Each structure stands twice: as structure tokens, then as C-alpha cells.
From Swiss-Prot:
Reactions this protein catalyses: (E)-4-coumarate + ATP + CoA = (E)-4-coumaroyl-CoA + AMP + diphosphate; (E)-4-coumarate + ATP + H(+) = (E)-4-coumaroyl-AMP + diphosphate; (E)-4-coumaroyl-AMP + CoA = (E)-4-coumaroyl-CoA + AMP + H(+)
Organismal lineage: Eukaryota, Viridiplantae, Streptophyta, Embryophyta, Tracheophyta
An annotated Gene Ontology molecular function: ATP binding
Residue ranges of the region described as SBD1: 265-334
Cofactor(s) essential for the protein: Mg(2+)
Natural source organism: Solanum tuberosum (Potato)
Name this polypeptide is given: 4-coumarate--CoA ligase 1
Name of encoding gene: 4CL1
Length: 545
């Protein structure tokens, strides 16, 4: 029976899920929670390596993760220490993450395609003591590792001075140290720019991730219904919280199989779906777009897929319709997340065990065991249904805060526990959430975050640039791409290509600036804030160089 979804609390209008609250075992460490029902699916496939079809059973994954915990401990990793996982999707990513959880240690995940400077910045900020990576990426941390006595573990070949991952697996799992993990201890430290500024470490706790996974897959009528006969396609990078949480951790909790793809390749992707009878496809809009546009799709039987979920960026109605035609038996819907929110705030109720009707373009309904409100960004007053305002969420799933940044934490989470998302949306009469705009400054390139402030800091470092602002430009393939408005220094003749080259040498591919517009001044408010609205309006009006 749907519960009452709207209440008033000290003047605030609060929205809750149509699904009733459930018991969540928040006292359990994350690994204990994920493997709580292990005996039911010990011998079932847990990880399927798409590269070589190697299958790891649940028993093997649990045992290997404990061995890795002991191996990490022998290399000096103690409770509350941080390891950096610098890997594409692979079984070792899973063993390392779960192994660290067993120790009460913290995993910070970084994109292996980051530049050396970006990797080192995160390793330093997170105080990582070990980096787990592939040989081809080890060079990115080589100098930093030597200077800071950092151990580098490689999962494939072993460059000089590195340790092979197999050494961790040779440990005796019975030697695992006895650690007392508290629910509020941090287990994952992804980096996010939040609503503004430079990337910051987001402290996600055991209790927070347990709560978030439970909100999705636990309960008699689970919001995201999955079971041990399901096969999930894990093509989204596990270093991204959406994949780590809604694919890996949710699947482990229910005993489903996880088909791991290192990277998205449409032909291999389409071959793997019928080969392994994939049933659940968690995607992002660029993958949905590739499926909708690929002529190859019609050559493959995709009838095994029963759920297609899209997140990380909004999906337009046309794209929804186009992809629906490609998956004849699938329910298609969206979720809405933000790293700081743990990450899932809303999930499509068409995915529930007892599904609800949903509207096209909605990004779900607030998850159970949580509260949502919509506030006027100027006054902070809560707003009724159908009125757009800033989306705020409260619940045990949200982050503990930003690492070593109490000011940014206080700007994001109110004293009453409300997390401000920086996204503008409204809740309609059927409790469905629609995103209409972003207060926050982030650019979303194919679902990846690009922080304008990070690119602006690099641009302003160039001697021929006196000021700069970066804003998103709409792009059919990527959703948004970063473009720069640049003020040349006196006498400078720097060109668009020179600016683009200067940036592309310092950042990962998706942060590269796609267009440069030279301007006399960057518009700013009296307090010095860049007026990005004005720059976006100039783009929309068709600015010319």
C-alpha cells in the first residue's frame, strides 16, 4: 500500500517515497552487508570477465577479497588508511575495494586516464599509501611514489619497483586483523566538484553505502528489483560512484552476476548481451545514444534485457523512445544521483518488483527511508508540488562531508541534515521528480563531471591570458562540452589552437576545451563571481569570435 508521500515539518513541505520505509541493517560493515546472504549463492557466478569469459563465483570473490585484505595489511595498510584504485573495470578492482573494506580502510578511486598531475593531486589530497593500477598507468605515479614511499601494485605485468597483485592473493585469509568498524567510518572516497569549485574528497561511510544499496534493492517490493538469476552489464567505470554503488554493490547484495567490460565498445557490447543473457543494463546517455544510432543493433538478440536504467545526466524523450524500440522486453527509466548524496536520490518506480506507471522524462521518485524537499534558491523556503526549486535530500545515505574541508561541507549540508544538490527540479502530482536546470556550475560531458573552476585555474596560469571563464556548450554527442571565454594579456596574440593545446596537455580528454572565444572582459558580479548565465546566454544567441 503506498504511504502518505507528503508531510509538513516545521514549515517545510517534505516528500517521501511511495514505497514504505524498511529495516536497514546500518550497524553492519559494507562487506558484511553485501555478503550477508552469501550461503544462498556461494557457487553462483559473481564476476564474469568480459575480456576472457573467466567466471568467479561468490565464494571465490569473498575469499579472494579477504586474502587481499591480509595482503594489504602485510604491506602496512591499517584501519582508516587510504588506498588508491587506479584501474579500469576488472575483477581486481572489486577484490581491492572489498578487501580494503574488510580492513576498515578507505578506497579512493581515480580515472586511470587522468594525467599524471591529476592522479598525483588526488593521491596527495587523499593521503593514499598504496596505488593499485595497471603497468601502463604506473608511470603516472612513479616519481610521487619514490618521493613519498608509496607502494605501487600492478595487476598485470610488473614494472621495476612495483609489486604484483598476485602477491596479495597468496596471503592466508585467516590472518585478517580483528578490526572494529563503526557505522560512521569512511569506506569510499570518490572525488567530486560538488556544486562548485575544485574536486573534493567525498566521505562515504559504511552506514551511508549500506543505506543507499538497501534503499534500492532491499525490501519486499524493492525499488530496483534484481535477484540472483540476473546478469548486470558493468560497462560504466567502477571508479564512478553510480557504477560502484548501483551496479557492483547492489548486485553483490542480491547475488546477481556482474559482467565486467573494461570499456565501452559497441560491437563487443552487443555480442556480450546475448552471449551472457544480460538482464539489467545500467547506462548513461552517451551509451544510450550509441545504441539508438548503431546499425549493428538489429543484428543482435537483445530480448534478455528486462531493465534499462540511465543515470548521470538527463535523458531526452526522443532518446528514450529510440532506445525503447531496441530492447523489446525492457522497462526503461531513469535514476537521479549525486556523489555527495551517496549517490542515489531518486529511482524510477517502473523498476520496482511491483511496478508503478511512470512518465517519460521523469528521473524517478525519491528513494525510501529518505526525505526530499524543493526550496526556493533565493529565500530557502520550501515549495509545493509542480514548482521548480533546488532539490534537497536528507537521510543516512548522504556523505559524512568533504575530506578536510569543513567550509565546503557546511555550504552543502545544513545543520538540520539537508544536502543541497545545486540541481533545479520539481515534484509533480504523482511524486515524480523532473530536473529542469542546474544551479551548480558543473559541466556534464557524457556523464563525467568537468569543473569550470579547475580549467579556469589552468587557463589563468598562462602568461598570455589575463582572465578566463569556462561554461558548457550544448553538444549532441556529449550532452555538454567545455568552452572558454578568454581575455588576452596586453600585447598577446595567443590563438584558439594554442589555448586548446595548452589545456589538453594537462587534463583528461573529457576536460579538453572545445572552443575558445576571445573577449574584452569576463562578466562578473559585484562580489567577483563569474556571471556564467550571461555567457551561456551569449552562446545560445550564437556568439561569433
Amino acid at each position: 500500500m503506498p504511504m502518505d508521500t507528503e508531510t509538513k515539518q516545521s514549515g517545510d513541505l517534505i516528500f517521501r517515497s511511495k514505497l514504505p520505509d524498511i529495516y536497514i541493517p546500518k550497524h553492519l560493515p559494507l562487506h558484511s552487508y553485501c555478503f550477508e546472504n552469501l550461503s544462498e549463492f556461494n557457487s553462483r557466478p559473481c564476476l564474469i570477465d568480459g575480456a576472457n569469459d573467466r567466471i568467479y563465483t561468490y565464494a571465490e570473490v569473498e575469499l579472494t577479497s579477504r586474502k587481499v585484505a591480509v595482503g594489504l595489511n602485510k604491506l602496512g595498510i591499517q584501519q582508516k588508511d587510504t588506498i588508491m584504485i587506479l584501474l579500469p573495470n576488472c575483477p581486481e578492482f572489486v577484490f581491492a575495494f572489498i578487501g580494503a573494506s574488510y580492513l576498515g580502510a578507505i578506497s579512493t578511486m581515480a580515472n586511470p586516464l587522468f594525467t599524471p598531475a591529476e592522479v598525483v593531486k588526488q593521491a596527495k589530497a587523499s593521503s593514499a599509501k598504496i596505488v593499485i593500477t595497471q603497468a601502463c598507468f604506473a608511470g603516472k605515479v612513479k616519481d610521487y611514489a619514490i618521493e613519498n614511499d608509496l607502494k605501487v601494485i600492478c595487476v598485470d605485468s610488473v614494472p621495476e619497483g612495483c609489486v604484483h597483485f598476485s602477491e596479495l592473493i597468496q596471503s592466508d585469509e585467516h590472518e585478517i586483523p580483528d578490526v572494529k568498524i563503526q557505522p560512521d567510518d569512511v569506506v569510499a572516497l570518490p572525488y567530486s566538484s560538488g556544486t562548485t569549485g575544485l574536486p573534493k574528497g567525498v566521505m562515504l561511510t559504511h552506514k551511508g553505502l549500506v543505506t543507499s544499496v538497501a534503499q534500492q534493492v532491499d525490501g519486499e517490493n524493492a525499488n530496483l528489483y534484481m535477484h540472483s538469476d540476473d546478469v548486470l552489464m558493468c560497462v560504466l567505470p567502477l571508479f564512478h560512484i553510480y557504477s560502484l554503488n548501483s551496479v557492483l554493490l547492489c548486485a553483490l547484495r542480491v547475488g546477481a552476476a556482474i559482467l565486467i567490460m573494461q570499456k565501452f565498445d559497441i560491437a563487443q557490447f552487443l555480442e556480450l548481451i546475448p552471449k551472457h543473457k544480460v538482464t539489467i543494463g545500467p547506462f548513461v546517455p552517451p551509451i544510450v545514444l550509441a545504441i539508438a544510432k548503431s546499425p549493428l543493433v538489429d543484428n543482435y538478440d537483445l530480448s534478455s534485457v528486462r531493465t534499462v536504467m540511465s543515470g548521470a545526466a538527463p535523458l531526452g524523450k526522443e532518446l528514450e523512445d529510440a532506445v525503447r524500440a531496441k530492447f523489446p522486453n525492457a522497462k526503461l527509466g531513469q535514476g537521479y544521483g549525486m556523489t555527495e548524496a551517496g549517490p542515489v536520490l531518486a529511482m524510477c518506480l517502473a523498476f520496482a518488483k511491483e511496478p508503478f506507471d511512470i512518465k517519460s522524462g521523469a528521473c524517478g521518485t525519491v528513494v525510501r527511508n529518505a526525505e526530499m524537499k524543493i526550496v526556493d534558491p533565493d529565500t530557502g523556503c520550501s515549495l509545493p508540488r509542480n514548482q521548480p526549486g533546488e532539490i534537497c535530500i536528507r537521510g543516512d545515505q548522504i556523505m559524512k562531508g568533504y575530506l578536510n574541508d569543513p567550509e565546503a561541507t557546511a555550504r552543502t549540508i545544513e545543520k538540520e541534515g539537508w544536502l543541497h544538490t545545486g540541481d533545479i527540479g520539481f515534484i509533480d502530482d504523482d511524486d515524480e521528480l523532473f530536473i529542469v536546470d542546474r544551479l551548480k556550475e558543473l559541466i556534464k560531458y557524457k556523464g563525467f563531471q568537468v569543473a569550470p573552476a579547475e580549467l579556469e585555474a589552468l587557463l589563468i596560469n598562462h602568461p598570455d591570458i589575463s582572465d578566463a571563464a569556462v561554461v558548457p556548450m550544448i553538444d549532441e554527442q556529449a550532452g555538454e562540452v567545455p568552452v572558454a571565454f578568454v581575455v588576452r594579456s596586453n600585447g598577446s596574440t595567443i590563438t584558439e589552437d594554442e589555448v586548446k593545446d595548452f589545456i589538453s596537455k594537462q587534463v583528461i580528454f573529457y576536460k579538453r576545451i572545445k572552443r575558445v572565444f576571445f573577449v574584452e572582459t569576463v562578466p562578473k558580479s559585484p562580489s567577483g563571481k563569474i556571471l556564467r548565465k550571461d555567457l551561456r546566454a551569449r552562446l545560445a544567441a550564437g556568439i561569433s569570435n
